[in-house]
Amino acid sequence: MQENNVQILVLDFGSQYTQLIARRLREYGVYTEIVPYFEKLDSIKSKNPKGIILSGGPASVYEKDAYKPDSAIFTLGIPILGICYGMQLIAQHFGGRVIKADAQEFGKAVLEIMESSQDSKDSSCFAFQGASQGIQAPMTLSFDIFSHHKFPQMLTALLDLWEDSVQASHIFLTKQHIAEIRLEVKAALQSSQNIITATDKKDFLGFIGVEKNKIEMLFVASSVFRKGIGKALLKEALERYLKDYPYILVDCNEQNTQGLAFYKSLGFEKVGMSEKDSAGRDFPIVHLKVSKAILKKALERGTSDSVANAFVCESERVFLRPYTQADFAALHKIVSDKETMYAWGQGFSKKQSQEWLDKQLAHYQQYGFGIWAIIEKQSGAIIGNAGLNHTEISLKGKTQKIVEIGYLLHRDFWGKGYGSEVARMCVKYGFETLGLEEVYCLIKEDNTASIKVAKRLEMQKVGEYPKPYKGKKISHLVFRLEKKVWQESKNNATQGFKSCSLFKGIKQDSIVWMSHADKVESIPQGFRELAKSGNTHYCAIADSKRKIYALQFHPEVVHSECGGQMLQNFAVGICGANTCWNMRHFAQNEIEKLRRIVYGGKAHCENPMSFMQIQEAFKHIGKAQTIQRLVEIWEEGARATHKDLSENEIAGMREEIREAILKSKNLLIAQKNEEWLGFIEIEKNEIAMLFVVPKAFRKGVGKALLKEAFMRYLGAFEVIKVNSLEWALGFYQALGFAKTGKKPIPAGSAGAFSPELIPLSIARESLQKSLGLEAQDSNEGVREKVRCAWATDKDEAARKLYEDYHDTEWGEPLHEDKKLFEHLVLEGFQAGLSWITILKKREAFRVAFDDFDPHIVANYDEDKIKELMRNEGIIRNRAKIEAAIINAKAFMAVQREFGSFDKYIWGFVGGKPIINAFESIADLPASTPLSDKIAKDLKKRGFKFVGTTTMYAMMQSIGMVNDHLTSCFKCNSSLGMQCDKILDFSQGTNTKSANLTKNPKNLHSHTANTRIVDSQHTESSDIKGQSHLESSADSGSAVSLRDFKSCEGATRGSYLEGNDRSGVANSLKITKETTSKVLCAVSGGVDSSVVAALLYRAIGENLIPVFVDTGLLRKGEREAVEKIFKENLKVPLITADASELFLSRLKGVLDPEIKRKIIGETFIEVFEKEAKKHNTKGEIKFLAQGTLYPDVIESVSVKGPSKTIKSHHNVGGLPEWMKFELIEPLRELFKDEVRALGRELGMPESMLMRHPFPGPGLAIRIMGEVNKADLDLLREADSIFIDELHKQSYYDKVWQAFCVLLNVRSVGVMGDNRTYDNTICVRAVEAIDGMTATFAHLPHDFLEGVSNRIINEVEGINRVVYDITSKPPGTIEWE
């Protein structure tokens, strides 16, 4: 199991703000932990983090006895980032001066970045504006998220921009139309959460609104039409919101010709048409669609095409571009200025300026480069010249041709760092673009500013040269910079700020939270200033050589976009942290960890090696992350086996490997416990790549990969080939490969950096034998490819169709939405027919149904239906055609709800296929409870022709269930993918399964043979002692039990005990090696329920979950909890009803603290009594509780460790005999992460999103004495409030909501009668973590409705009030 390896370690003393840092980094997939400042160095080293963050709150570095981190952390050689207090600590430790502030101050300030990456563009997209010099100069756009709730004052400005835009582009609209549509746009702006605005720091230039994968709004001010604003907004939306969708949709008015042209220029294609707009107006709407890949390329091309003539290279503030004749006036203004040209001795005349310009234009033609114009981005003005020039010099008596860099700045721009900026760009261009090995710079002896620049670039003085000019020889110093030095320079001076890319992508003038507490007045030696902000003395400093960075930002800044970006830059860009952590990894790891704890340090089984195709990896972790991880596998191996490789060679080979991986089709990845161990790529009959991580060397991984590849691909060829590296010859020759006799392939043939390769080959039978894959009596032979019995036909063409389908599709996991829709439609058409009929007509179906694009199919009209009914190539059944159209609409509705149909349908099996081990067709069921469940849900959503048998067949065809028979060669191959859900049917099947051959109506028929799929999760499947295994599968859990005694026997991927599959059934019997049990108190809340579900997945019936009904629960609480545990979680909950006991002991008690104490003591008493029933032999060894990360770190003191944990998060006060060993599975998680874990475990959203509920229950929501009558009254009122919140969709928008019975009576009027009844207080708050909270600004009409319902429906209440107190000063609960 891949451990949750710490990537970033945050050292802190318990600041709640520091939690945000860990949470934000985990959002980026970077696993982050928080430990106290006083953590021992050995403990820190043992965690082996890739980076450390020193955070903390207001504790001064001067505070007496305050704990400080061990200073030895600065010697570990890993990057360190100090934030707030961490910055002060760093500054003081390295000799800087820190001044103590009189008082803490926090506020917002403008961030001014002093230096940023010279190698990367500004993170904002560039639009272009005309400039006086006749060029296109980029205007820097700022992008912000618009929220009407936060910025209501901006609404009018955006509406005015919209109106300006449509008046210019929608000339067909009348004033009445515009006024009408303006109201609709206003409503959309008020309700949408995904609106991005573009400004030039003064005015709004445009905005875009998206919903899932659809562009709902895109408008640009008429003054900046055709200047790239629309593309810039689209690019920003693609990066923020649309990047996870394969296709992007947009609707455009047919009469908006400018808009249609714009979208079509970006690759959008028409996929449908509506005669009316969404409001029913007679405006035809064109439905457009484009793939993400095409749009991304179009936007990149659009940017580069627009900029191609504008710049050669760029930095944060300027870009360089070739001069044109139109630039003469601007050029002459600079070179004619005597002060600017002091190094030349005089200014240029117009003739000299023209001659110089002609020379550069000629150089562009001759060399492709020369001296270029420096364009300041902000103004668009030419401010000088910079570039490279061919020249000849004599150095140490030897004449040589060189390329020199040079620049000239107008005097108004001296002393502002532009010299270093343009010099760095020229150096980079020379080395990276021109491929030079060295560059020179010739500087006059008295030009001290330029000499400083040369030294900053680490150029070395190599001599002097008298440079001729106008008949004179002017002495110049000669500086040289070698490429090797430039590359190896640790402080990356020539690359600008790349090594310290803390501010990469951060916009200049960003608004950030600042901490004006103790300030750094002077920075230590070796540090430099990175940014300024507000009135802090120093805002950001760094020592890039030691990789130590410090920020004065208040940790609250991590809430912001730029704060998150800085953290990501540090973790990923500087520390090289991987971003593969996710909740699934955590869940799987935690299950294994819990088993080891409970079962005496031993996990119940060693998970086998499994294999997945690269396409599956793309689906799980994304394309970029997959390729990065594969390249890392290659690089680790390369560095271990080729220690003589230079960094330059590694870098070159890395890119070649990346390209090869990108182009690969048949690439398999070996993994064990989610850890990637190696990969193999096959091209026809050739092994193209085979790489293994060093720690897996000589452990059979390479052979296992080759074995898997043989089973899947290579077994079809007579001869298998490979071009081997010299050092790998032994591996291949041991398997029987021999040299072909051909000459070795020279180094550099396959790629610029490819090494020499030796051609090898082997006969199929020989490799089959050496891999241990010889044919056995059990029909495992590869030679003849024994298939499932249904995959044949008397007709040769039909048999070939069946075989191809069986070998390449059937049972293979499918995740592409369009293909899933195809299968859904074809399964419906197949109903009542043989599957071979579908296979023969499939290509015709694809043409007829527009390649099964649901967006197109959903818009089919009567004419299209008639056209399809005339198509002889398909099955002409009107009901099924109409069903396909209906299903397309329902399919898109599912996509909108779940993000993709794939996510919805695979959610039924937790994202992993169910793999069965049937021996004959007679064992196969026609349907299962799971297919029943899917069919029922699809029908509820409006789908047609989705009966349970049809759905079972579809589950098989898309690989949700794998029913390849044990005799089939694909069974071994597929079993390598997952062992999580293999179930044992060897002990018997139900009557329905056993009698399939007697009842042909149950068969999903191909021809005379039967295509039937998926295992049944029923009681008849006899897995003794493991009924919870079926439960796990039924619940759709993404994390299923792996508690198999000999799990490796169930999958061919282990290779620890050969390839014997005879023990599949027996391998699934679990033996209980220990009687240790875990006691868990369940309250019905999110935390304890997740703990119980997680533990049950890990240890099954060794968990004792106890739910105590105190009688203080909300209406229907007990019934809801019991139902969820029984039906959703499949966890056998033990309920102890002690309601009467609790009420009797609370009688007459008024003081809230005494209430709490009584409830706590009574709970312990009941809990103890229930525990004793299950501990007769001392089996209970552990106590599980839902302690979260905030509970752990909030207990840490500034001055040292504290063993106390907040009592309301624990079962405190347990008797001595119950002092079990504590298990806290959630102690590394935050509340939102606990919910994410619950989703992975298949828990229902209704449970996960429940509001917090206090341990003492309703007792502290009744002011005064607690009795049954008041509890019933409060339950009714509270139930009404919660019900209304759900109805109006406010429930999920507030952190917590409830009613309080004040026990304050007041006079009221009901009809003609006066009343004197009780008062209910309604409370709702908004919060992030409950540390602070503000009252929810619920609409008055909503509150009025709640009040009316409570007063009318709850007898005894005649007044309702709303609590508008925030925290602080108040608390969320009343007692």
From Swiss-Prot:
GO terms for cellular component: cytosol. Residues 7-119, 501-580 form the Glutamine amidotransferase type-1 domain. GO terms for molecular function: acyltransferase activity, transferring groups other than amino-acyl groups; ATP binding; DNA-3-methyladenine glycosylase activity; GMP synthase activity. One of its GO terms (biological process) is base-excision repair. Residues 120-500 are annotated as: Insert-1. It is an enzyme of class 6 (ligase). The keyword Nucleotide-binding applies. Residues 597-1071 are annotated as: Insert-2. SUPFAM superfamilies: Acyl-CoA N-acyltransferases (Nat) (SSF55729), Adenine nucleotide alpha hydrolases-like (SSF52402), Class I glutamine amidotransferase-like (SSF52317), DNA-glycosylase (SSF48150), GMP synthetase C-terminal dimerisation domain (SSF54810). It catalyses: XMP + L-glutamine + ATP + H2O = GMP + L-glutamate + AMP + diphosphate + 2 H(+). The active site is at residues 84, 554, 556. Pathway: Purine metabolism; GMP biosynthesis; GMP from XMP (L-Gln route): step 1/1. Residues 1014-1027 have a biased composition (Basic and acidic residues). ATP binds at residues 1083-1089. Residues 141-300, 318-484, 612-765 form the N-acetyltransferase domain. Residues 1011-1036 are annotated as: Disordered. This is Probable GMP synthase [glutamine-hydrolyzing].
